[in-house]
Amino acid sequence: MRQEGVPSFFLVMFINFELFLLVMEKEVKYPTAEQIIEYNVLALTLIKVKKADRPQVLSHARIELIIKNCKQLEGDLYDKAICLLKGIIQLHPFASGNRRTAFIVAKEFLKENGGKFNIEDDPTQANVMQGIRENYYTDDEIKEWIQHGKIKAFKRFEK
């Protein structure tokens, strides 16, 4: 004996589930290699540090690897932003300005995807970027820094 209302219940549940998937599958916008290279040029133009700074790509393959790793990473937008940030800093795809470029790329990635980047554009943040390069911070600490702008001071490991 068929119960009235059951098929319509499942139909409503199916439709709601499909709508849920559409909302959840909001396309994440990843930077292209060309955009990351443009951000490097921008970083070196806007933030002068050394006279010898020059926009030069050392490895296109490293840039592509950084993007690929970010796309494959399970996690939220902040985890992916950290992947971009650390990837550019640690894989060093440019002759100059890797940390400055990483900062801009992570910030723009989050803004483009509706995330928040609560780190001040301040030269004092350079020490934190050095700490990221040297694996001083955990990903959770970096996530907290991006979301709330606070992180412990970087101190070099003593030998």
For each predicted feature, which ranges?
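FIC/Doc superfamily catalytic core
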Residues: 2-159
